[in-house]
Swiss-Prot record:
The keyword Protease applies. This is Non-structural polyprotein pORF1. Residues 1468-1579 form the RdRp catalytic domain. Residues 241-439 are annotated as: Y-domain. Residues 56-240 form the Alphavirus-like MT domain. The lineage of its organism: Viruses, Riboviria, Orthornavirae, Kitrinoviricota, Alsuviricetes. GO terms for biological process: DNA-templated transcription; methylation; mRNA modification; proteolysis; RNA processing; viral protein processing; viral RNA genome replication. Its cofactor is Mg(2+). Zn(2+) binds at residues 671, 673, 686. Residues 714-792 are annotated as: Hinge. GO terms for molecular function: ATP binding; cysteine-type peptidase activity; helicase activity; metal ion binding; mRNA methyltransferase activity; RNA binding; RNA-directed RNA polymerase activity. Coiled coil: none annotated.
Length: 1707
C-alpha cells in the first residue's frame, strides 16, 4: 500500500511557516503600542475591540480611562495624518504643543472641569498663550486660537479635525459651521453607542456601562476611575442615523474608521449628496432583549432601583443564538420553559480547558436572566405557531391550487402574474404583524441595523430676522431675550465629553450676575482660629489675634476689590486685582488669581471664595487641605486697644522674620489685615495709612526691603548687670559724659542735618531746635559729679554675645565706636557734636583709612566709624538705613553703636533698632537713650511663652481629678489649670553641670522636685523643697524653681508654673521625661514643649570616657573631672546599684531605679541591666544616659543580656581603643571650617533660567552623545585570573529599570545596576585580576615621598579621634552593637562585605560601548573600623601638619585657600595624572609602604601585622556571592582615602620631576601639579613596570581636579559641564524627597558660581573645547532646576546584558 499521499510536503510546510512568520513580523512592526497599565479584563476588552489590529503592551503610565484613551489616540493619529494642515475644534490643552500642523484652534470659555484642564496645561510654547487667555479671560494674542466656539468662529480653513468635540452639535449645525469656515472636509471622532436607540434604562455590556435617562446618556468603561462620557441622547441618535445633510449647506457623512462604537466620520461638502446607507454595528457582540416588565413610575418615598432598570438587556450574541437554536430545534413534546432555563444556566458558565476557552459564559443579573427566558420562550412559541399555521395553510392552498380548472389557471397566468411582483407565499393570505405587537419580536439585533437618513440644513434666514426683531422689541420692553430660534451650539471644543480627558464637564452658558459686596463688615480674630491652625500660626500669636476686632470697608469697581481695614489706631489698605504678586518671605513667588465674577481668589496652597448672604459676607478659605468657613456681619466694630494692636503687629513681624530665617522655601508674608481681615490670608498691595507722618512704622510689617541676612535673633532675657536706676529727676547729679549726647542742644544746625520741626511722635528724638520756631532758651547747667563706676545698664543679651545697654556708648570697651555722622563727615549736632568734642582729630578726611559706602573708618585718635543714616525729614528710605548699619561691619573687633538717625534725622526708633538687629556682628553693643529705652521696654524680647490651650487645660484638669482621688494626690482637690500664657526661664545643662548649685536662697521661695531623694538633698542645703503633690499648697504667688522639670508629671508642672509669680525650670531635655504610670494616655497628650533659655555644657561630675560616650546627645559637652577612665565591664559590683525596672529593684536589695536616681550624684555606681528592661532601654535612650552619668569616679556595668550594647554603649569600643594604645587627651579636631561665599560681584544674576531640554541637547551635540535606548549595560564578564569565586545557583536579572530623569541623553559611562550578574562581573573584573607583585626595598620610594611628606615621628591616639569615630557612626544611624571584641577566630570580626555601586562616571567619550565593569564598595567590619580608625585619623592629622603650605591633601583645606594658591601661580601649566584601575593595581609594594609609615608613627607591631594580613588575603562577601582573593585595595576600609592619597603622592614624586613647582593637590587617585615643566625620572620605568601601574599624563594650560577647573593665575572654578553631565544620570525619583535633595545640591553648586559665573563660562568652555554659549545655557538650566521648575520624564528602559561566561581558576 502506498502512503505517499499521507506524507507532508516539507517545502510547502516551510513556505507556509515562512509566510506566517512574515505576516507576524509585519503585524508586530505595525502594531499599536498600548502604554497604560491594564487589568486582565481591560486587556481582553481592548483586544476584542481593536481587532484585527495587532497590539503590543508596554505598560508605563496610569490613566483614568485607559480603554477610551487608547482608542482615542489611535483614531486621533489617523485623523491628523489624513487632515494635514487643518483647523481643530475643541483641542485638549495638553495636545496644543504636540501638534504644529494645526492652523487654528476653536475653544469655548472654560467652565467646570475645563478650568482644571487649563490649569494643568503646559506653561511653555503655544499652550502658554491659550492657557493665559482661558484662565484670565483675556482676548487671544494671535490668530492661532479663539474662544468663540466652532459655530461662532470664521477662521478660513479647508480641512478640519474634531476629536470627540461634536457630541452636542447637531449634524445640520456642523454643516453650517463648516460653510462659515469655508471647510470642505472635516474628520470627526465620535462615540456613538447603540443603546441610545433604545428606551431609557441601565445597560451593562462587556465593555461599558450605559445609563440612559431619556435625555442624556452616561457611559463608563471598565476600570474607569470616574464617570465617563455624558451626552444628549437625541443628538447621538441623529449622528447614528444621519448620512447626509440637505439644504443650503449639503454634506455627506461617511464612516471611515470604527473601533467598537467609536467612529471616525468624514464630513465632506458635496453639492448633491447621494444615498449612503450603512450598517453601523456589524460586529456587535450584544443582542438587546426586551423586558416585558419594564421600570415602574417615579421613585417612591424610599429610593428604589426600579426606575433605573432596563427595558432592554444586553445579551451576548453567542448566548442568544445558541439559546434560540436549541429552543427552535426541540421536539414539541420536549419543549418547555424549565428545559430552556436549564440550558441557559449551562451555557452561562465559563469553561476553560487548559488555555482553551470551551465556553465563554455570561455573568448576568437576575433581571436579565428573567427577561431572556421570557423573551426566548415567547419568541420560540411564536415561531412554532408560525410553523404550524404555515404548514396548515400551505396544505390547504396546495389542495385549492391543484383542484383548479384550466380556465382558472389561464386567468391567473394572464392577469395575476403580469405587472406584479411575485413573492411565493403571499397567496397564503397570512396576517401582517404590527410593530407594537408582541409577535413583532422581543429583541433588537444591532448587526442588522441599516441607516440612511437626511437632515435638513437649519438655514432659516427669514425666521431668524423675525426672531431678532422680536428679541429687540422684548428688550425695549425691558424683558429678557427670547431668541428661541437660534441654533443650539451646545458643547464644543474642550467641553466635549468623549475625549478621555473631558469626562464630566458641566456647561452653563449663561453669564452669572455680578453681586456687589461693597459695604462695611466686622471681622474678629476669634472667628479665624481654625485658619490660624491651618496656616501654622504660633499659639501665642493666634491668641493675640483672637482678642482683636477690625472694621473692613469694601468697595468693588472695575474688576477689583479695595479693602480698608481699621484695627485700633491703625488703618491698612489692600487692593485685590488679578495677577498681583503677593509678598513672600522666601524664594517662592505667589501670584494672586482673582475672579470677581466667580467671587474666588487663590495663590499657592491657599484659595478663597466669598458669597453675600442675608447674614453677611460668607467667606470659605481652604489652606493646605484644611478649610474654614466664616460669616462676617455688616456693621462697624468696636475699636481694639491700641496697645494690643501694636503688640500683635510686632509679634507678627517677628514671626515673619523667623520664618524667613529658618525656612528654605518660606511662604506668604502675613500682614495684620491678612490675618484679621476680610479675605485671609491675602493682603495684596498692602499699605499702612498712619496719622503720624514720622512714625515710619508702615515699613515695619513688609519685607520688600528686608533682603539682608541676619546676624542674630531675639533670645530670652539674661540677668542684668546691677546698676543704678536711670536718672529720673532734673536735679540728679550726673556725669556729663554719661548724658545721651543726642539730647544736647547744638550750637548751630549743621548743613548736613538741618534742624527738624517739632513733632508729637514718641519715636522722635529730643532735639529742641526748630527751623520754623524760635530757639528755646538753654537749660541751666547741670552740676557735674564724677561717679566711681560706669552708669550703663544692661537691658538685653543676644545669643551671639551682643548686648543692648541704657547709657552712653563712650563707656563702652568695644574696639570701635560708631558715630551718627552726616554725608560730608563734618562736625555737626547731637551725637556727632559729642564725638567732635572728644575726638576732633577723627573728622580729618586725610586720616580716613577706608570707606564702605557712605561710612568712613579712622584710627585717629582711636578706631571710629562715621556712619550716615538717611534723612527721614526728606524721604523715608529703609534700604539706606539698612545699608548705614551694614557698612559698619567691614571690620575686625566689636563696635558700640547708637541708634543711627533717631536724633535730628527723625528716623523712628523701632525702624533703626530693627536695622541694627539685622546688621551687626557678634559681641557688638547698642546704647539707647531715654526715649529709645522706653520704646525698648515696651517692645523688649520676652521670655519664652508656653500657651495653655483649652484642650490642654481640659486634659490637665482630668489628670488632676484622677490624682486627687489617690492618697498621694489628695492635696490636688479643687485645683484647676486655666487656659493662658506662661512665661518662664529654663536653664538646661549637661549632667553634673551645676544647675542646682546655681540657685541662691535669696532668689527663690519654693523648690519643686520630682522625688524624695532630691527633696532631701535640697532641704539639706537649706531650701524649702517639696514634691509635686505637696507643693500645691505653697506655690501660689511664690518664686518657684522646679528641678528636673521634664520629669515632673505635666499636669502638675503646668499647675505650678501657672500659680507661681515667677518660675525658673532646671533640667535636661535629653534625660528621662515624665512617665505615664497609669497608661491613661494623658501624660503624652499634655507634655509641654519647653525651650531652654540657657545651656550649660561644662560638667563637674562625668569622667572623660563617659563624656565621649554621650557626646552624641551633648555635642558641646566638656568636663572638669580629672578621671580619665571610669567605665569597667566584668568587675565586681561597687557603690550604689542602679537598675531599670521595679522587678530588678526587688531582686537587688539596696538598689534604686534609674528614674529615682535622676538628679543624684554618687562616687561609685554599678549599672545592672536585666532582660526585662529591653523594651525600656530601646524605646528610651535617656534611661541609659541617666544611668551612665550618676558617678564621679567609677562605674561597673553588668550587662549580661547585652541591652546597653544595642543602644551604642559598648565595652568593645572602649576596650579596643585602649588595646590599640589609645590615650586620654585632646587633639585638634579634623573638621575644616568653611566660610560662606559673599556676593561680591554676583555675576550669576546675569544668567537667566533656561530650558533644560535645549541645554542638554546642545551638550549632546557638542560632546557627540546621543539618546541611550537602554538604562544600563551588563558588560562581558572577564576571566577570573586569581582567587576563588563562589556563585549563586540562580543568576536572575532585571530586564528593565524605572527612572525619573531630566533628559534621555545620558552623558555618563553607563554601568551595571545592582543585580547578580553585575556583581559577578565587578568581583571578577575588579578583584579577580592577577596582581603583579613587586619585591623591592621601599627606601627610594619613601625618599621620593619626602618631597611631600617628611619623616613622621611617633604620635599619640587620643579620645578626640575616638569621639570623631563615634560621632561618624551616630551620624550614619549606627550604634555600638556592630563593634565586637577583638576575637580573630570569629568571622564576624573580619568579614568584608561587598556592595555594588549604582553611580556612573561622567565622560566625554563613549557612554555605552565602553566595555568596563562596574565599581563596588568592599566595606570592612565595624570592629576593624573602630580598631584602625582612630589611628588612621591621627596619622592623617600628622601628615596635614607636616605638609608644605602649597601642598593640599584630600578635602582638608578651605576651598578659597586652594583657589588663592592657584591664582598665585601665573605662567604655570597644569600637570594631571589619571590612574586606571587604581585600586586593582595596588600590591604588596604599596602595602609595604603603608606599613612603613605606620611604623614611623608608632603603631603597635601587632596591629601592623594584622593590617598586612587582612590586606594580603581576604574574602569579599556579597549578598549571594563571595570571592576569595589577594592583595587588592578595598574602597570601604577605614584608611581608604589616606593610603590612596599617600600612594598617589609616592608614585608622582618618584616617577616625575617638576620644575618651578608652585601648587600640588592630591585626593585619592586624583592629582594635579602646577609647574613650568616636568620630566619623567630615571627610576620611573622600574616602578611602573614592577607594579603594573597605568598612568595617563596630561600637561596643558588649564586642567581638571576633584570637580573643579584649575586655571593658573585665575583660581579654581566649578566644573559646570561635569556637574550638569552627572545630573543627567541621576534618578530623580521615585519620591519627591530624592528630587528635593538633588535640587538642594544644585543650589549649593550655584552658590559657588555667585561671583565667578562669567569667568566660568570662558574658562570651562576652553578646557572642554565647547562653545561658551553651551556653558551659559547649562548655568541657566541649573537655575531652572534650582527654582523647582524642572521637568522629569518617567522612563522604563531595558538593561543590555552582554555577560557571557565566567571562567573559574583556583590558586
Amino acid at each position: 500500500m502506498e502512503a505517499h499521499q499521507f506524507i507532508k510536503a516539507p517545502g510547502v510546510t516551510t513556505a507556509i511557516e515562512q509566510a506566517a512568520l512574515a505576516a507576524a513580523n509585519s503585524a508586530l512592526a505595525n502594531a499599536v503600542v498600548v502604554r497604560p497599565f491594564l487589568s486582565r479584563l481591560q486587556t481582553e476588552i481592548l483586544i476584542n475591540l481593536m481587532q484585527p489590529w495587532q497590539l503590543v503592551f508596554r505598560p508605563e503610565v496610569l490613566w483614568n480611562h485607559p480603554i477610551q484613551r487608547v482608542i482615542h489616540n489611535e483614531l486621533e493619529q489617523y485623523c491628523r495624518a489624513r487632515a494635514g494642515r487643518c483647523l481643530e475644534e475643541g483641542a485638549h490643552p495638553r495636545s496644543i504643543n504636540d501638534d504644529p500642523n494645526v492652523l487654528h484652534r476653536c475653544f469655548l470659555k472654560p467652565v467646570g472641569r475645563d478650568v482644571q484642564r487649563w490649569y494643568t496645561a503646559p506653561t511653555r510654547g503655544p499652550a502658554a498663550n491659550c492657557r493665559r487667555s482661558a484662565l484670565r479671560g483675556l482676548p487671544p494674542v494671535d490668530r492661532t486660537y479663539c474662544f468663540d466656539g466652532f459655530s461662532g468662529c470664521t477662521f478660513a480653513a479647508e480641512t478640519g479635525v474634531a476629536l470627540y468635540s461634536l457630541h452636542d452639535l447637531w449634524p445640520a449645525d456642523v454643516a453650517e459651521a463648516m460653510a462659515r469656515h469655508g471647510m470642505t472636509r472635516l474628520y470627526a471622532a465620535l462615540h456613538l453607542p447603540p443603546e441610545v436607540l433604545l428606551p431609557p434604562g441601565t445597560y451593562h455590556t462587556t465593555s461599558y456601562l450605559l445609563i440612559h435617562d431619556g435625555d442624556r446618556a452616561v457611559i463608563t468603561y471598565e476600570g474607569d476611575s470616574s464617570a465617563g462620557y455624558n451626552h444628549d441622547v437625541s443628538i447621538l441618535r441623529a449622528w447614528i442615523r444621519t448620512t447626509k445633510v440637505t439644504g443650503d449647506h449639503p454634506l455627506v457623512i461617511e464612516r471611515v474608521r470604527a473601533v467598537g462604537c467609536h467612529f471616525v466620520l468624514l464630513l465632506t461638502a458635496a453639492p448633491e449628496p447621494s444615498p449612503m446607507p450603512y450598517v453601523p454595528y456589524p460586529r456587535s457582540t450584544e443582542v438587546y432583549v426586551r423586558s416585558i416588565f419594564g421600570p415602574g413610575g417615579s421613585p417612591s418615598l424610599f429610593p428604589s432601583a426600579c426606575s433605573t432598570k432596563s427595558t432592554f438587556h444586553a445579551v451576548p450574541v453567542h448566548i442568544w443564538d445558541r439559546l434560540m437554536l436549541f429552543g427552535a430545534t426541540l421536539d414539541d413534546q420536549a419543549f418547555c420553559c424549565s428545559r430552556l432555563m436549564t440550558y441557559l444556566r449551562g451555557i452561562s458558565y465559563k469553561v476553560t480547558v487548559g488555555a482553551l476557552v470551551a465556553n465563554e459564559g455570561w455573568n448576568a443579573s437576575e433581571d436579565a436572566l428573567t427577561a431572556v427566558i421570557t423573551a426566548a420562550y415567547l419568541t420560540i412559541c411564536h415561531q412554532r405557531y408560525l410553523r404550524t399555521q404555515a404548514i396548515s395553510k400551505g396544505m390547504k392552498r396546495l389542495e385549492l391550487e391543484h383542484a383548479q380548472k384550466f380556465i382558472t389557471r389561464l386567468y391567473s397566468w394572464l392577469f395575476e402574474k403580469s405587472g406584479r411582483d411575485y413573492i411565493p407565499g403571499r397567496q397564503l393570505q397570512f396576517y401582517a404583524q404590527c410593530r407594537r405587537w408582541l409577535s413583532a419580536g422581543f429583541h433588537l439585533d444591532p448587526r442588522v441595523l441599516v441607516f440612511d437618513e437626511a437632515a435638513p440644513c437649519r438655514c432659516r434666514s427669514f425666521l431668524r430676522k423675525a426672531a431678532t426683531k422680536f428679541c429687540c422689541f422684548m428688550r425695549w420692553l425691558g424683558q429678557d431675550c427670547t431668541c428661541f430660534l437660534q441654533p443650539i451650539e451646545g458643547r464644543v471644543g474642550e467641553q466635549g465629553y468623549d475625549n478621555e480627558a473631558f469626562e464630566g464637564s458641566d456647561i452653563d452658558p449663561a453669564e452669572e450676575a455680578t453681586v456687589s459686596i461693597a459695604g462695611s463688615y466686622i471681622v474678629t480674630g476669634s472667628q479665624l482660629q481654625p485658619l490660624y491652625q491651618a496656616l501654622g500660626i504660633p499659639s501665642d500669636l493666634a491668641a493675640r489675634a483672637s482678642r482683636l476686632t477690625a472694621t473692613v470697608e469694601v468697595s468693588d469697581a472695575d474688576g477689583r476689590l479695595t479693602c480698608k481695614t481699621t484695627m485700633g489706631n491703625k488703618t491698612f489698605s489692600t487692593v485685590f486685582t488679578d495677577g498681583t504678586q503677593l509678598e513672600a518671605n522666601g524664594p517662592e513667588q505667589y501670584v494672586l488669581s482673582f475672579d470677581p465674577a466667580k467671587q474666588t481668589m487663590a495663590a499657592g496652597p491657599h484659595s478663597l471664595s466669598y458669597t453675600l448672604t442675608s447674614a453677611g459676607l460668607e467667606v470659605h478659605v481652604v489652606s493646605a487641605g484644611l478649610d474654614c468657613k466664616v460669616v462676617f456681619q455688616s456693621g462697624v466694630a468696636a475699636p481694639s486697644a491700641a496697645g494690643e494692636v501694636t503688640a500683635f503687629c510686632s509679634a507678627l513681624y517677628r514671626f515673619n522674620r523667623c520664618v524667613q530665617r529658618h525656612s528654605l522655601i518660606g511662604g506668604l508674608w502675613y500682614h495684620p489685615e491678612g490675618l484679621v481681615g476680610l479675605f485671609p490670608p491675602f493682603s495684596p498691595g498692602h499699605s499702612w495709612e498712619s496719622a503720624n507722618p514720622f512714625c515710619g512704622e508702615s515699613t515695619l510689617y513688609t519685607r520688600t526691603w528686608s533682603v539682608s541676612g541676619f546676624s542674630s535673633c531675639f533670645s530670652p532675657l539674661e540677668p542684668c548687670v546691677p546698676s543704678m536706676p536711670p536718672p529720673a529727676e532734673v536735679n540728679t547729679p550726673v556725669v556729663l559724659d554719661a548724658l545721651p549726647s543726642e539730647i544736647m542742644e547744638p550750637a548751630q544746625p549743621p548743613a548736613s542735618e538741618p534742624a527738624a520741626p517739632p513733632s508729637d511722635s514718641v519715636d522722635n528724638s529730643f532735639s529742641p531746635t526748630s527751623s520754623g520756631a524760635p530757639i528755646a532758651p538753654p537749660a541751666p547747667a547741670l552740676p557735674v559729679t564724677h561717679l566711681s563706676g560706669p552708669r550703663r545698664r544692661l537691658l538685653h543679651t543676644y545669643p551671639d554675645g551682643s548686648k543692648v545697654y541704657a547709657g552712653s556708648l563712650f563707656e563702652s570697651e568695644c574696639t570701635w565706636l560708631v558715630n551718627a555722622s552726616n554725608p560730608g563727615h563734618r562736625p555737626g549736632g547731637g551725637l556727632c557734636h559729642a564725638f567732635y568734642q572728644r575726638f576732633p582729630e577723627s573728622f580729618d578726611p586725610a586720616e580716613f583709612i577706608m570707606s564702605d559706602g557712605f561710612a568712613a573708618y579712622t584710627l585717629t585718635p582711636r578706631p571710629i566709624i562715621h556712619a550716615v543714616a538717611p534723612d527721614y525729614r526728606v524721604e523715608h528710605n529703609p534700604k539706606r538705613l539698612e545699608a548705614a548699619y551694614r557698612e559698619t561691619c567691614s571690620r575686625r573687633g566689636t563696635a558700640a553703636y547708637p541708634l543711627l538717625g533717631v536724633g535730628i534725622y527723625r528716623v523712628p526708633v523701632g525702624l533703626s533698632f530693627d536695622a541694627w538687629e539685622r546688621n551687626h556682628r557678634p559681641g557688638d553693643e547698642l546704647y539707647l537713650t531715654e526715649p529709645a529705652i522706653a520704646w525698648f521696654e515696651a517692645n523688649r524680647p520676652t521670655l519664652p511663652a508656653l500657651t495653655i490651650t483649652e484642650d490642654t487645660a481640659r486634659t490637665a484638669n482630668l489628670a488632676l481629678e484622677l490624682d486627687a482621688a489617690t492618697e498621694v494626690g489628695r492635696a490636688c482637690v479643687g485645683c484647676r489649670v486655666e487656659p493662658g500664657v506662661i512665661h518662664y526661664q529654663f536653664t538646661a545643662g549637661v549632667p553634673g553641670s551645676g544647675k542646682s548649685r546655681s540657685v541662691q536662697q535669696g532668689d527663690v521661695d519654693v523648690i519643686v522636685v520630682p522625688t524624695r531623694e532630691l527633696r532631701n538633698s535640697w532641704r539639706r542645703r537649706g531650701f524649702a523643697a517639696y514634691t509635686p503633690h505637696t507643693a500645691v499648697r505653697v506655690t501660689r504667688g511664690r518664686r518657684v524653681v522646679i528641678d528636673e522639670a521634664p520629669s515632673l508629671p505635666p499636669h502638675l508642672l503646668l499647675l505650678h508654673m501657672q500659680r507661681a509669680s515667677s518660675v525658673h525650670l532646671l533640667g535636661d531635655p535629653n534625660q528621662i521625661p515624665a512617665i505615664d504610670f497609669e497608661h491613661a494616655g494623658l501624660v503624652p497628650a499634655i507634655r509641654p514643649e519647653l525651650v531652654p533659655t540657657k545651656w550649660w555644657h561644662l560638667t563637674y561630675r562625668c569622667p572623660a570616657d563617659v563624656c565621649e560616650l554621650i557626646r552624641g546627645a551633648y555635642p558641646k559637652i566638656q568636663t572638669a573631672s580629672r578621671v580619665l577612665r571610669s567605665l569597667f565591664w566584668e568587675e565586681p559590683p561597687v557603690g550604689q546599684n542602679l537598675v531599670f525596672t521595679q522587678a530588678a529593684k526587688a531582686a537587688n536589695p539596696g538598689a534604686i531605679t534609674v528614674h529615682e536616681a535622676q538628679g543624684a550624684t554618687f562616687t561609685e555606681t554599678t549599672i545592672i541591666a536585666t532582660a526585662d528592661a529591653r523594651g525600656l532601654i530601646q524605646s528610651s535612650r535617656a534611661h541609659a544616659i541617666v544611668a551612665l552619668t550618676r558617678h564621679t569616679e567609677k562605674c561597673v556595668v553588668v550587662d549580661a543580656p547585652g541591652l546597653l550594647r544595642e543602644v551604642g554603649i559598648s565595652d568593645a569600643i572602649v576596650n579596643n581603643f585602649f588595646l590599640s594604645g589609645g590615650q586620654i587627651g585632646q587633639h585638634r579636631p579634623s573638621v575644616i571650617r568653611r566660610g560662606t561665599i559673599d556676593n561680591n560681584v554676583d555675576t550669576l544674576d546675569a544668567f537667566p533660567p533656561s530650558c533644560q531640554f535645549s541645554a542638554y541637547h546642545q551638550l549632546a551635540e557638542e560632546l557627540g552623545h546621543r539618546p541611550a535606548p537602554i538604562a544600563a549595560v551588563l558588560p562581558p564578564c572577564p576571566e577570573l585570573e586569581q582567587g576563588l569565586l563562589y556563585m549563586p545557583q540562580e543568576l536572575t536579572t532585571s530586564d528593565s529599570v524605572l527612572t525619573f530623569e531630566l533628559t534621555d541623553i545620558v552623558h555618563c559611562r553607563m554601568a551595571a545596576p545592582s543585580q547578580r550578574r553585575a556583581v559577578l562581573s565587578t568581583l571578577v573584573g575588579r578583584y579577580g585580576r592577577r596582581t603583579k607583585l613587586y619585591e623591592a626595598a621601599h627606601t627610594d620610594v619613601r625618599g621620593s615621598l619626602n618631597h611631600f611628606i617628611p619623616e613622621l615621628g611617633p604620635i599619640n591616639v587620643t579620645t578626640c579621634e575616638l569621639y570623631e569615630l563615634v560621632e561618624a557612626m551616630v551620624e550614619k544611624g549606627q550604634d555600638g552593637s556592630a563593634v565586637l571584641e577583638l576575637d580573630l577566630c570569629s568571622r564576624d570580626v573580619s568579614r568584608i562585605t561587598f556592595f555594588q555601586k549604582d553611580c556612573n562616571k561622567f565622560t566625554t567619550g563613549e557612554t555605552i560601548a565602553h566595555g568596563k565593569v562596574g565599581q563596588g564598595i568592599s566595606a570592612w567590619s565595624k570592629t576593624f573600623c573602630a580598631l584602625f580608625g582612630p589611628w588612621f585619623r591621627a596619622i592623617e592629622k600628622e601628615i596635614l601638619a607636616a605638609l608644605a603650605p602649597n601642598v593640599f591633601y584630600g578635602d582638608a583645606y578651605e576651598d578659597t585657600v586652594l583657589a588663592a594658591a592657584v591664582a598665585g601661580a601665573p605662567g604655570c601649566k597644569v600637570f594631571e595624572n589619571d590612574f586606571s584601575e587604581f585600586d586593582s593595581t595596588q600590591n604588596n609594594f604599596s602595602l609595604g609602604l603603608e606599613c612603613i609609615i605606620m611604623e614611623e608613627c608608632g603603631m603597635p607591631q601587632w596591629m601592623i601585622r594584622l593590617y598586612h594580613l587582612v590586606r594580603s588575603a581576604w574574602i569579599l562577601q556579597a549578598p549571594k556571592e563571595s570571592l576569595r582573593g589577594f592583595w587588592k585595595k578595598h574602597s570601604g576600609e577605614p584608611g581608604t582615602l589616606l593610603w590612596n592619597t599617600v600612594w598617589n603622592m609616592a608614585v608622582i614624586a618618584h616617577c616625575y620631576e617638576f620644575r618651578d613647582l608652585k601648587v600640588a593637590a592630591f585626593k585619592g587617585d586624583d592629582s594635579v601639579v602646577l609647574c613650568s615643566d616636568y620630566r619623567q625620572s630615571r627610576d620611573a620605568a622600574v616602578l611602573i613596570a614592577g607594579c603594573g601601574l597605568k598612568l595617563k599624563v596630561d600637561f596643558r594650560p588649564i586642567g581638571l581636579y576633584a570637580g573643579v577647573v584649575v586655571a593658573p593665575g585665575l583660581g579654581t572654578l566649578p566644573d559646570v559641564v561635569r556637574f550638569a553631565g552627572r545630573l543627567s544620570e541621576k534618578n530623580w525619583g521615585p519620591g519627591p524627597e530624592r528630587a528635593e535633595q538633588l535640587r538642594l545640591a544644585v543650589c549649593d553648586f550655584l552658590r559657588k558660581l555667585t561671583n565667578v559665573a562669567q569667568v566660568c563660562v570662558d574658562v570651562v568652555s576652553q578646557v572642554y573645547g565647547v562653545s561658551p554659549g553651551l556653558v551659559h545655557n547649562l548655568i541657566g538650566m541649573l537655575q531652572t532646576i534650582a527654582d523647582g521648575k524642572a521637568h522629569f520624564t518617567e522612563t522604563i528602559k531595558p538593561v543590555l546584558d552582554l555577560t557571557s561566561s565566567i571562567i573559574y581558576r583556583v590558586e
